[in-house]
Amino acid sequence: MTDIAIRAEGLGKRYRIGGPQARYKTLRESLIEAVAGPVRAVGAALRGERNGAERDVIWALRDVSFDVRHGEVVGVIGRNGAGKSTLLKVLTRITEPTEGYAEINGRVGSLLEVGTGFHPELTGRENIYLSGAILGMKKAEIDRKFDEIVDFAGVEKFLDTPVKHYSSGMQVRLGFAVAAHLDPEILLIDEVLAVGDAEFQKKCLGKMSDVAKGGRTVLFVSHNMAAVENLCQKAVMLDEGNVT
């Protein structure tokens, strides 16, 4: 088994901004584009014009490379817009990188944006079992963790309510409880301390510390430098999509 839990190699993510939305082309339009497109591109190049696609893009990540070993606790820090959340979305396969590659070796539990991974029409109870099934757990395994998850999240009274009716704080509490208690080998957490009261934040830090002491890998995005210093062994600093 490899010693590397997470590897990013030359990772880049580009987004198109502005411009018209893409639509399906007719067969006639596709044939015309196939013939005329290269001719127009050569003409534009000779005139020194740039392609519109090149003008209207933004790189959220560019040439990001790092390794996280099994059992390490690593913080990801940087200003708003530095690319931290985009990095976790690429690592969790929510979005594909434009260039480079990301490698994850182990079962992943993650909490990204509020409600990510939950089906809004399903109840809290149903979403707990759905999340466990997605992680490859058997029902008996989830049963053993169920009470602990519910107690940590503090949503006992709302277990049979669809999560679309949960407040953002309730969704984050349940999402973190599911991610941290279903025995992930790798835990990816994005700004969980930005939502919830001080008591919940303290519980989250305590649970992440327990996960780390159990030999699991943790990648923790946060603006809370004190929390990163206390919890993490090292940190990755992102600035405008680049590792600094």
Task: Describe each region flagged by the PLM.
Residues 240-241:
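Conserved ABC ATPase "signature" C-loop
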Residues 230-237:
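Conserved catalytic segment of ABC-fold P-loop ATPases
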Residues 2-63:
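Pre-NBD coupling/linker segments of ABC/ABC-like ATPases
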